[in-house]
């Protein structure tokens, strides 16, 4: 609908009253607008300072030709003073903003912006975009933070704006849904839609100038707008932290509720329940919801509200008299919240609440489209109308006779006689299982009642295998016997159709980027990886039926002779409690691995035959023809070898064996393993995890030599000094020396900042170099013998992530930092021999082009690989990719490629690159050319690993963030083998050639050993 002239006059008249208007902001004067909290200090921006900076940014936008009513996309790393002020400058420039995913590839970002009709983009810090799709217009420093402005290049015919109508007047922002209520949609939000929400919440929660609101919701999740605008509406203060809940809940807790009484804590906190739980019940009760905490309002939304049983573990009933604990509900389609309930009792069920604004209308529709007291909830409003092209441009858009526009929530609710609304479940959580319709939400609630208050459960449906999986989050690890007792108790309290096929125990549930329970990731963690058919049956028998494996075969034989009644694997499947329903489930899963359909049918018949013991079934599975890893692979092209002999030319066709990796063992580290894996002389494997656990393992069996529990998480690669001494950096800012065989701590040295960079032992074995995130000195040199500090210095203005590169011949180091600085430093005394600077940060560890070379390679995060001279650091050649580079580079100089070296690295543009590097005479020049690149289907953060496997030759191991792992031919980039781990992979692998095994950490909490 095109607004009339009167509407335009009214909207212009209302402009000064908008909560983000610069004059309104300036009126709050010296009131703090934003506090940026770090461990060392608070950076405070007042409303007056904010107004001045907004004016500067508005001039910057106008100078670069940004017109009124333009859409400006935001590609920002996190909430910072600069990003907040840029949003306000965009709005005051009569434009609207469009938050985007910072991890999105440039091509996808270009496509999304084109669909949204957005022509401009602002990126901050190290984030960049490909020049193929975007034109750089200019940059500006905002509180020492670089902000760059781009414009999309001319759109192709394939990229069309989605909306068929003009955008609403007074546009405020455009945002994409997460897909919770269906596939992701673009939502265009005018000011008139969000403003009443902010005014209503301000009144109901009594928000005032005295409040401090945590700005912690990601910019791509629309509740962040509520946090942001609540402060502007009331002159309250926003608080941001350098840490996130995904990074370190404990550090976020310390930032929000500091121990120092002189430092103010927050008063308003908005989170999803899943994210809030990550604080831990004890911290929630003692610090967040204690009577003495600064918190005044807690808003939990985006997911089902916690149960009364869980609430009791979080707070004393008296807290409800002091604080507003709120269930807040809404959908992005009516931005942002619609219903609010302030909890009055810890014993009563918590409803969805009542409308925040008076004009919000509720409607419940059942399956037959009749208005009912049970069914799907629809939210409607006369005033609060977002424009959703995908929906509103359809002829049958949902609107009743009164002009109210209704939006589906995708949630099933129940309305009681007094009008109170209660959440039931998601509408797509009802699935069909063996002819029965089952409700995942109902089953979850039934199982939750069987669990202690400290445990949490959710049920998942694996469509491909038609399997019901019950995930149980337990903070304390359980023995198999304890798990078995609990699962049988659960099975006795649900119907056969509701009984889970598998129970999975985890110590934490993963969250997506918006803080909601990530069910897709949870499913990946639960699906067994390449599990042998026998093990599938054994696991099912153990988890679901009354049959356990006999540990002592001789004892079982004696028992069978002494006792006529069969037991254990002498039982038939039916005697063990199996039904045809169970048999179908097992055959469906095992059948995916069977090559012959008749064998799958025969397995089903054996399971239902009461005269066939399980022992016989297991023997049959041992002989059945199975497809390894359930992946069909292309045949590897055969190599042709030509040779000569006395009788003439003979051509032999030699077929290289098809590569196949299988899992030999895996070890649970309880939390993510992002650290690179280290091996020592083929005898030890060592790695640390987010769980603070550091393990040294036997590479052949996975058995544990030692375990060390450090105070904080570990993302640093272990360095071995000897077989009895290794060292590792920790998030607590200390370097630890430990005995890998016993686990005893040998030394502990405080460095002053978290350590992600691998500590380096110099070639002469006399010094240890440690690079860190410390604020004062980010490079330390210690004596290897006594760990005394020999020298320390600071390079650049930012921390150091990359490991240093040693130049043994020059007795120097190359050190790269996160502000782009890179320096050559003398090992003997720490003197800086030269310093240069790239435009962007460096996460990638530099590497020499050859073992003895005048050239080293280094990669900027912005996607540029540079060849630099060792003598002065000057750039000799550059190769550019279209994505960020976090992977380190691996260099190889094969004897068959005379005069060439090859550099291999991963990129978040989903490609693995191999560059051909040719040096000129005297090593004074170099050429970098693309040798090959491979699309692996997902971003790559982990450093690739080179493997020599005979007779296949040199291979490249590559792991992507979605769990894909693959082996690639070094010569031509052809994929020789691929599979997928259950979780994301950020860990760099190691390879022991004699054992032909690869060791890699995964975000499903396991360290995997895969054998070739």
Swiss-Prot record:
Specify the taxonomic lineage: Eukaryota, Metazoa, Ecdysozoa, Arthropoda, Hexapoda
Which Pfam families does UniProt cross-reference here? AMP-binding (PF00501), Beta-prop_ACSF4 (PF13570)
Q: Which residues bind ATP?
A: 177-185, 411, 426, 516
Q: Which InterPro entries match?
A: AASDH_AMP (IPR048005), AMP-bd_C_sf (IPR045851), AMP-dep_synth/lig_dom (IPR000873), ANL_N_sf (IPR042099), Beta-ala_Activ/Resist (IPR052091), PQQ_b-propeller_rpt (IPR018391), PQQ_rpt_dom (IPR002372), Quinoprotein_ADH-like_sf (IPR011047)
Q: What keyword terms does UniProt attach to this protein? A: ATP-binding, Fatty acid metabolism, Ligase, Lipid metabolism, Nucleotide-binding
The record's Gene3D superfamilies line, in alphabetical order, gives: 2.40.10.480, 3.30.300.30, N-terminal domain of ligase-like, YVTN repeat-like/Quinoprotein amine dehydrogenase
Q: Which family does it belong to?
A: Belongs to the ATP-dependent AMP-binding enzyme family.
Q: Could you give a single Gene Ontology term from the biological process aspect? A: amino acid activation for nonribosomal peptide biosynthetic process
Which terms in the Gene Ontology molecular function aspect does this entry carry? ATP binding; beta-alanyl amine synthase activity
- Write down the SMART domains for this protein, in alphabetical order: PQQ
Disulphide bond pairs: none
Q: What is this protein called?
A: Beta-alanine-activating enzyme
Q: Please describe what this protein does.
A: Covalently binds beta-alanine in an ATP-dependent manner to form a thioester bond with its phosphopantetheine group and transfers it to an, as yet, unknown acceptor. May be required for a post-translational protein modification or for post-transcriptional modification of an RNA.
Q: What is its EC number?
A: 6.2.1.-
The organism's place on the tree of life at top rank:
Eukaryota
